[in-house]
């Protein structure tokens, strides 16, 4: 990814940068990007001082989303080349803890918009897709078990075999627990947003991180269930064009997303809980103004 930079000019900013993985860019009317001011690149490539809103017709889309799965997201590269963005179409970076509250917090009446955490929404989106895909695989797996025989001795219907009903039960177990945990996490998120609104305070940051812990594990549980079903179903579902293939490709790509890395978020939470800075985070903390 090229360095993203902007220069402050009269009435706004001139912005230049290259952004990969911009999901939905082909159908968007406006796109949102973060830029660093020319004199503030201390955090390197990911430095972000200002979030901008840029019309679709002022950017170039490079169709480079040539990946194994999730092709429908259209997560292509977007190039911004010396585009002027007026100041009223920008907000400060949400990475800056010393900045004033976002003006949009006062626009909507719903507590999730007025007090909710952005990370909670993003993590829930990815996790729900993982669980939905796992349920799709579960449907295929049940159909397979009901209609096929085993391929090794004893040659019996899979429903009568000692192991296949158990494999199905284990898959249901993992998916049901993941879904129930996600729904409860979402309920806890909304409850905390309402409490924060009633008490005129920020969303509890420790709870926010714990909710993220839950959601990432939910996605992993769904993925583990999919791998169990894929492995025990045999090669029957691996034919070209089979829905099994599509689900496997999509799940494998989904699990590479940075919002479904449970080990990383567990390390992040644990270090903060014991008063330590997350690894490499020192450069991302701006100095108090």
Tell where the protein language model's regions lie, with residue ranges.
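Generic recognition of long tandem-repeat/solenoid scaffolds
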Residues: 12-16, 78-81
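DPxDG-like acidic metal-binding loop motif
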Residues: 18-59, 63-64
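Glycine-rich beta->alpha junctions and the first turn(s) of the following alpha-helix
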Residues: 68, 75-175
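Generic structural signal for well-ordered, non-transmembrane alpha-helical segments
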Residues: 128, 132-135, 169-176, 212, ...
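Extended, amphipathic, non-transmembrane alpha-helical segments
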Residues: 143-147, 181-185, 224
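C-terminal helix-coil-helix/basic helical segment that borders enzyme active sites and/or dimer interfaces
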Residues: 179-217, 230-238
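Glycine-rich phosphate/cofactor-binding loops in nucleotide/flavin-utilizing enzymes
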Residues: 233-289
């Amino acid at each position: 990814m090229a360095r993203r930079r902007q220069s402050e000019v009269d009435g706004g900013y001139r912005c230049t940068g290259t952004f990969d993985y911009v999901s939905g860019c082909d159908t968007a009317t406006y796109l949102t990007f973060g830029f660093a001011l020319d004199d503030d690149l201390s955090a390197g490539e990911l430095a972000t001082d200002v979030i901008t809103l840029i019309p679709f017709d002022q950017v170039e889309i490079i169709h480079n989303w040539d990946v194994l799965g999730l092709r429908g997201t259209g997560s292509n590269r977007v190039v911004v080349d010396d585009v002027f963005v007026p100041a009223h179409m920008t907000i400060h970076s949400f990475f800056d803890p010393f900045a004033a509250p976002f003006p949009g917090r006062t626009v909507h009446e719903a507590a999730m918009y007025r007090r909710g955490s952005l990370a909670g929404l993003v993590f829930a989106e990815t996790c729900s897709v993982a669980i939905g895909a796992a349920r799709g695989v579960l449907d295929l797996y049940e159909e397979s078990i009901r209609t096929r025989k085993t391929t090794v001795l004893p040659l019996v219907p899979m429903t009568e075999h000692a192991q296949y009903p158990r494999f199905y039960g284990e898959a249901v177990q993992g998916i049901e627990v993941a879904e129930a945990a996600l729904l409860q996490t979402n309920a806890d998120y909304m409850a905390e947003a309402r409490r924060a609104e009633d008490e005129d305070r920020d969303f509890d940051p420790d709870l926010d991180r714990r909710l993220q812990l839950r959601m990432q594990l939910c996605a992993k549980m769904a993925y583990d269930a999919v791998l169990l079903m894929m492995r025990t179903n045999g090669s029957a579902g691996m034919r070209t064009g089979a829905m099994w293939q599509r689900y496997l490709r999509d799940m494998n790509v989904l699990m590479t997303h940075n919002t479904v890395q449970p080990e990383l978020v567990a390390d992040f939470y644990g270090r903060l809980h014991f008063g330590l800075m997350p690894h490499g985070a020192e450069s991302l903390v701006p100095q108090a103004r």
